Design a protein with these regions (language model features):
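Positively charged n-region of N-terminal signal peptides that target proteins for export
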Residues: 1-7
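Membrane-proximal alpha-helical signals and transmembrane carboxylates
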Residues: 7-10, 15-392
């Protein structure tokens, strides 16, 4: 028995040495796709009608249908700068009847294997949302594709998504770095809430609605953040501007710093908020939700105001009170707009109730939109100006 074991050891060692990776691809034979831009194809209207009719079609007619135009952007690693760690962008644009079809057509046009494990940016053309049946197929593919990076950032773009991939930013080598950095900077002042694929899937499954950042392209080179789109059933219901997004993130308690402004005696005064403490008290009485927001902030005054001489002055208290009233009014208008007009829970109130008040959630979950619309919501805002800046 011992001799048999001794004889088996060399065989096992040889088998380990002969083991290899059967599907390995050299790194210089890969195209690391960083940006995926999806536009409508010339035949998308016909494709949408076929989906709605639920008719069976021949394979030949499917193959001829250019439903989508997809652009894959990737860095040119042949000319990568070793010091900067970056390279200029290359792209491949193909048309097809589905995301799978465009992928295989892109492979046929490329001498390299497309790799999606490091993808950073997904650009969805605004026109796609005019065809929710097609967009649903696109998103189903994206959600299920195992090779796609789950932290890829998602955005909606006005105009052709392909045009954004071709932009050469002044401050970055690649468009994916530029837009993701732009969203990162904007999130610091509360004007945008970056959304990656994982967060998008969670929003859709939890609320059947989502919000995505919206960008526009001016003069073929100037990319601007214009706000956020509210999406339900793969259709854009409305848009939220930067100020509304700031208020949403304050009410969510999901913001680090931001800026608010008022006008006092002809002077514009900026209040740079450094800290936000948000509390939401939730109660359920007489078959009705009762919600109370308490928002406490600390920050610094910016801009010119001649009478702001000391933190103890009555003028500072007046300014604080004016900001309290202004912000409370903005918050109330936003809440009424989102629950009565949009009928979408963009404030994630349902998430708070589900996580921390399960008993209340069981009472309202079957009729959540109506329960939110009928809820009594009150708001209290307390601003604390800690600093008025330097003066001579």
């Amino acid at each position: 028995m011992k001799n048999k074991i001794i004889k088996l050891i060399p065989i096992m060692m040889i088998s380990l040495l002969l083991t290899g990776c059967w599907d390995s691809v050299e790194i210089d034979r890969k195209a690391f796709v960083s940006t995926i831009a999806i536009d409508v194809g010339e035949d998308i209207k016909a494709r949408s009608e076929i989906i709605n009719s639920k008719e069976n079609t021949s394979e030949e007619s499917i193959e001829k249908n250019n439903t989508l135009r997809v652009t894959y952007g990737f860095p040119d690693i042949r000319n990568m700068d070793a010091k900067k760690g970056t390279a200029s962008e290359l792209s491949i644009t193909v048309e097809g009847y589905s995301m799978t079809d465009t992928y295989f057509k892109a492979l046929a046009k490329s001498s390299r294997t497309l790799h999606f494990g490091h993808s950073k940016l997904l650009l969805l053309s605004e026109d796609l949302f005019k065809y929710p049946e097609v967009l649903q197929e696109v998103m189903d593919y994206i959600e299920r594709e195992p090779s796609l990076n789950r932290t890829i950032m998602m955005t909606i773009v006005k105009g052709r998504a392909k045009d954004y991939v071709e932009v050469k930013p002044v401050t970055e080598e690649n468009i994916d770095n530029y837009i993701t950095s732009l969203m990162g900077n904007s999130s610091k002042n509360g004007t945008v809430a970056p959304v990656n694929l994982t967060k998008y899937i969670d929003m859709v499954k939890s609320y059947k609605a989502s919000v995505l950042p919206v960008f526009s392209l001016e003069n073929e080179k100037d990319i601007q953040l214009t706000g956020m789109a509210v999406i339900e059933d793969f259709t854009i219901k409305d848009y939220l501007d930067n100020n509304q997004m700031t208020d949403i993130q304050i009410l969510r308690g999901d913001i680090g710093s931001c800026r608010k402004a008022i006008n006092k005696e002809g002077h514009n005064i900026d209040y740079y908020i450094k800290n936000v403490d948000r509390d939401l008290h939730i109660d359920y009485e007489d078959n009705k939700l009762k919600l109370k927001y308490t928002i406490d902030t600390e920050g610094t005054l910016k801009g010119y105001y001649a009478k702001a001489e000391s933190l103890d002055s009555e003028v500072i208290k007046e300014i604080e009170q004016q900001f309290n009233e202004s912000m409370k009014k903005d918050f109330q208008e936003l809440i009424d707009f989102t629950r009565n007009n949009l009928k979408v829970d963009v404030l994630d109130i349902g998430s708070d109730i589900r996580r921390f008040h399960k008993g209340i959630w069981n009472e309202v979950k079957d009729n959540w939109p109506q329960a939110l619309e009928n809820a009594e919501i009150s708001i209290e805002v307390n601003n604390d100006i800690r600093n008025i800046g330097l003066s001579n």
